[in-house]
Regions:
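Outer membrane beta-barrel strand-and-loop segments of large Gram-negative receptors
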Residues: 402, 410-412, 457-462, 468, ...
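C-terminal beta-signal and adjacent terminal beta-strands/loops
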Residues: 636, 687-707, 724-726, 733-803
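Surface-exposed extracellular loop regions of Gram-negative outer-membrane beta-barrel proteins
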Residues: 180, 321-322, 326, 444, ...
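Periplasmic N-terminal accessory/gating domains of Gram-negative outer-membrane beta-barrel systems
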Residues: 70, 77-85, 99-210, 221, ...
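Periplasm-facing N-terminal accessory domains of Gram-negative outer-membrane beta-barrel systems
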Residues: 4-99, 103
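Transmembrane beta-barrel wall of Gram-negative outer-membrane proteins
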Residues: 241-267, 280-319, 339-367, 421-422, ...
């Protein structure tokens, strides 16, 4: 084979395995054919390993073929700074023919063999390419049909009308604490993700009706896969930009290539951007840092041992007392200084081994910790007229309003066994176990207007366990038809809640003409945020009353049916209809509109009165996705959803949930232009349109009495803000040299500066003439993020002595 002159080259290598047993496949033919007609071929060895050397950089199709297995096609993007390491999973054919060639599964098909519907694979490549995603898996997932972000300031996602509280993050089989900076206790999102996409391999995202191994969720699951570091040469990545400065290093830990490391860290301070006049959405400067690592060892017995970790910390001070200009538009509450910080971390040990050609075991032990702490000072302010005639705000006095510290430590264990009974039957059994210790302390003023009269709202030290066993079975009826069935169970000791059997089923039929139909359903259950069980509203410090400690699981039944067709040139269309019934939703005992179904997407905790599991909810909708995967330097994605999301509180009234925007549509497109052999210019555009947020009428008297925004209960979610619209644009330039790849990018979020309304906020006027005027309301509209330019410079390079 000849090398194309002056074009940088790179290595493609990896491992070919059976998709169900994970055992290595010997003799798999791996082939790359480039545009010039030149071909690169390799055969996998006894351990399933293959290597293609000196492949020209660029976008290529990697095709893997093996007798009695489906053909698999993988799109590979090669750069000169990093080797491409792939794991290619092949599915065994049912038909007993000597050799059969079958069109491989579509790009983006999920890694989990048990998933038949409502699932999507996402890659690092996609999180980088989609405008507005900020290299964040959650924000990237908001482009999928049925998914939308809750607001611009956070990465919480709403899946089919469900609260973000129902989203579960998993890594190597164990459940993670909220992997976001500035995360409110019990939530699943935040302003900035701790998860760095450079740390991940291809991963799965599930939207309800998921396989039996996933539990404690009525909404969705991110099943994250951590990639291994390069085990043959040392590679480095550096990046500087709006979201922080980061470094990553990876490489072998011995000369045999049996051990590797991957270490990365990031630190961000946005004060420099604020000083030069770039708006970052707030006058307060958020400070955060995070890191991750993975050490991987290939053991002599054929097993694999990995030590991994992830963590981050963040702090912010929102000091309204420093603001002198008279305006109602404050970030946060306009009558208090707020100091808030969070931290999370997880360290785990994962072991994987093929016991034989048909049986595979994986297990993980991990410890994780999360902390949230805050204190607020109440401000008594007035207006001061200066000698110049200007009016400014002065602080007459301030005093402590509230403070809290929550700590949760979790000891987790996970084990699962895959056994391939035959070509047609696969069974998987396993269990997740969590031991959780809690230390919760919180005090707040009984009456905001009366200093130093505090009540201990949380004062709890204790422990609980969450146990989730499962079993699932896959029946490959033929090469065209699959059926899955499973059962998930769940027990939570704090509330003594038990869901003894949650059945899950899925079915898929692949028809002629590259099209398929699929259907499935399942029962699911979910515990509430831990702090809601230990709230002490009515008791004293000496005799606390945990009035919600016996709160049961919220439950749901979710069903779906869909159709998918693939056309030439990488174009596909997919549509899915779903129906979800939620029951045993926690609502107040006293008749009201309150329901836990509406919470989980704000910077506030919930202070719930006595709750009972009598609420209900209904979500149903129709989704469509038209997509062209990145091929021949172009991609596009259209996703649209029409949906309805309603609930009933304890007052028996059917209302819109807080996430019932009725519709959401996304259109993304991107094009890369090659300039010579080594330069690539990338352009991407994204347009989002969605129904506005629901809200209600303000109870002015109660708001003034409580010093906090209070809505009329009877009119909750009866109004709607105007529709949401946002245009994002991304521009990038990439240069490949012999051993380096340089990339400069600019992500222009909300390019048009559209003023989308986030909600109302409590903003009392300090002017007596205004506050006494007829029709006065102590509120202000709070808008979402304005125009935000996010730039970065990234460099990938390898050590000079590596080839």
């Amino acid at each position: 084979m000849t090398l194309i002159a002056q074009t940088p080259t790179q290595t493609i290598r990896g491992k070919a395995v059976d998709s169900e047993s994970q055992s290595p496949l010997v003799g798999v033919k791996v082939e790359v054919k480039i545009a010039s007609g030149e071909q690169f071929r390799a055969l996998s060895d006894v351990d399933g390993n293959f290597e293609l050397s000196k492949v020209p950089i660029g976008k290529h199709q990697v095709v893997a073929t093996f007798a009695m297995y489906e053909t698999k096609t993988v799109t590979a993007e090669l750069s000169s700074g990093k080797e491409l390491i792939l794991t290619i999973s092949l599915s065994e054919l049912i038909n007993k023919q000597a050799e059969v060639s079958v069109v491989g599964r579509r790009k983006g098909s999920v890694l989990n063999e048990m998933a038949m519907l409502s699932a999507q694979q996402f890659s690092v490549e996609e999180t980088n390419r989609y405008p507005g995603s900020r290299m964040d898996p959650a924000r990237m997932a908001s482009n999928f049909a049925g998914v939308q972000g809750s607001d611009d300031s956070r990465n919480d996602i709403v899946i089919r009308g469900n609260s973000p509280l129902g989203v579960v993050w998993k890594m190597e089989g164990i459940d993670l604490p909220n992997p976001s900076h500035f995360a409110i206790s019990g939530s699943t999102g935040g302003p900035v993700s701790i998860i760095n996409n450079k740390f991940l391999g291809n991963s799965d995202f599930f939207m309800s009706a998921f396989p039996a191994e996933y539990g404690n969720s009525t909404s969705g699951v991110f099943d994250l896969k951590v990639r291994n570091g390069n085990d043959k040469r040392h590679e480095f990545t550096g990046q500087f930009g709006f979201l922080g400065t980061e470094m990553m290093a990876e490489g072998p830990m011995n000369k045999k290539g049996t051990a590797s490391y991957l270490i990365m860290g990031r630190y961000s301070t946005l004060s420099i951007f604020q000083k030069i006049g770039i708006q970052i959405g707030t006058d307060a400067v958020p400070v955060y840092g995070d890191g991750a690592f993975k050490f991987n060892w290939k053991l002599k017995n054929g097993g694999n041992l990995a030590l991994f970790g992830l963590g981050g910390a963040s702090n912010i001070a929102i000091e309204i007392s420093k603001q002198k200009e008279y305006t109602k538009e404050f970030y946060g509450e306009g009558d208090r200084d707020q100091y808030f910080g969070t931290a999370m971390g997880v360290v785990g040990l994962n072991y994987k081994k093929s016991l034989n050609e048909k049986t595979y075991i994986t297990s993980t032990l991990a410890i994780s910790h999360e902390n949230q702490h805050a204190n607020h000072n109440y401000l008594v302010r007035s207006l001061d007229t200066l000698s110049s005639g200007a009016i400014e705000i002065k602080v007459d006095t301030s005093y402590a309003l509230m403070a809290y510290t929550f700590n949760f430590t979790k000891y987790s264990g996970f084990v699962s066994i895959n056994h391939k009974i035959s070509k047609q039957h696969l069974i998987k059994v396993g269990i997740n176990m969590d031991l959780i210790t809690m230390q919760q302390l919180d005090s707040g003023l009984v009456d905001i207007g009366v200093p130093n009269d505090f009540k201990r709202r949380w004062d709890y030290n204790g422990a609980c366990v969450l146990i989730q066993p499962f079993v699932q079975w896959k029946w490959r009826i033929s090469d065209k038809m699959d059926f899955t069935a499973g059962v998930h169970s769940q027990y939570f000791s704090l509330s003594n809640s038990l869901s003894i059997a949650e059945p899950r089923i899925g079915w898929k039929y692949r028809m002629n003409g590259n099209q398929s139909i699929f259907a499935g359903g399942g029962m699911h259950s979910q515990m509430q945020p831990l702090y809601t069980y230990t709230y002490n509203k009515y008791g004293t410090q000496d005799k606390p009353i945990y009035h919600n400690k016996n709160m049961d699981f919220m439950r749901s039944v979710h069903t779906g049916i869909g159709y998918e067709k693939f056309f030439k040139k990488g174009i596909s269309i997919r549509t899915e209809a779903y129906y979800q019934y939620l029951y045993k939703v926690p609502v107040t005992i006293a008749p009201s509109s309150f329901s836990m179904i509406n919470l989980g997407s704000s910077f506030s905790r919930v202070f719930a009165d006595s709750l009972e599991n009598t609420g209900t909810g209904v979500n149903y909708g129709l989704e469509i996705t038209i997509q062209k995967y990145f091929d021949k330097n172009f991609f596009f994605l259209f996703s649209g959803t029409l949906y309805n999301s309603e609930y009933k509180g304890s007052d028996g009234v059917t209302r819109n949930t807080s996430y019932n925007g009725k519709y959401v549509a996304n259109l993304l497109a991107g094009k890369e232009f090659k300039l010579g052999k080594n330069n690539v210019i990338g352009l991407g555009i994204k347009v989002t349109r969605a129904g506005g947020k629901k809200y209600g009428y303000v109870d002015v008297n109660a708001t003034n009495q409580n010093y906090d925004l209070t809505f009329l209960d009877s009119a909750f979610n009866t109004r709607q803000f105007k529709d949401y619209f946002r245009l994002d644009l991304k521009i990038s330039w990439r240069l490949n040299t012999a051993k380096m790849t340089h990339e400069i990018g600019l992500d222009l979020v909300n390019l048009l500066g559209t003023r989308n309304i986030l909600g109302l906020t409590y903003a009392p006027s300090l002017n007596p003439a205004e506050s006494s005027a007829p029709g006065y309301q102590p509120t202000a509209e709070k808008t979402q993020l304005g125009f935000l330019p996010i730039f970065y410079y990234k460099i990938d390079f390898r050590r000079a002595t590596d080839h």
